[in-house]
Amino acid sequence: MRMSEYFRILQGLPDGSFTREQAEAVAAQYRNVFIEDDQGTHFRLVVRNNSGLVWRTWNFEDGAGYWMNHVIRNFGILK
């Protein structure tokens, strides 16, 4: 296996608010990260596991990306 195949470069979210494009790029990397409560410009990014909801945040909240990155690192399931 080549080193480039072993390591995947994953896109994370900025520490503050994030855009739909950023959320879609992150959600596309994981089996358990979803966009929900879509209201057009505002939506929630959600992490779930077998037991249900782990964490969710609105895309415009202060520190939304920081905390979501933390949760995804701990609970995200890569595709």
From Swiss-Prot:
Gene3D superfamilies xref list: ykff protein like domains
Repeat among keywords: no
InterPro entries: DUF905, YkfF-like_sf
A Pfam family per the record: DUF905
Keyword set, alphabetical order: Plasmid
Superkingdom of the source species: Bacteria
Family: Belongs to the UPF0401 family.
UniProt protein name: UPF0401 protein YubL
Species this protein is from: Escherichia coli (strain UTI89 / UPEC)
